[in-house]
Amino acid sequence: MKKLVITLSLIAVAALAFACKSGSAPAIGKVIKSGPAGNNLTVSLATSDGVLKHGNTEFTLSFTDVGGKPVDVGAVALTFHMPQMGTMQAMNDPATFTTTETPGVYRGKASIQMAGESQAKITYEGPAGRGETSFPVTVQ
C-alpha cells in the first residue's frame, strides 16, 4: 500500500510539472517595454532588473501570440537608435542574439554607447512571417 501511494504521488508530481511547463509563459525577467510586432504578435524587451543600462548589457526579447504563448519568429534583429543631437552623431547600437530553450524567446547582448532616450528598432523574419516595430526606451 505504501509503495502504491508513493508511486501515485510521483506520477501526480510529474504530471503537474509537465502541465505547468507546457502552458506557461517564458520567464524573461522584468519587462521594460512591450508592443505590437505585427502578425498578431507582441514583442517584449526585458532585463533581470527591469533597467536597460548603457555599456555592455544583456536582455531578453520575446514574441508572444494573443494568448501569451511564445512564438518562434526565426531571425531577429534589434538596433538601439539615438538620433543626432547638435554636434553629436546619431548612434546605432546593434544587438546580437542567441536562441533559448523556449522558441520565441531570444537572449540578446548589446554595447549601448550612451544613456538617454533611444528607439528600439526590431525586425524579424521566419515561420511567423516578417515584421518590424519600434518603441522608445530609456537607457540608464
Residue ranges and their predicted role:
Residues 1-19:
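Sec-dependent bacterial lipoprotein signal peptides
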Residues 19-140:
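Intrinsically disordered, low-complexity terminal tails/loops enriched in metal-binding residues
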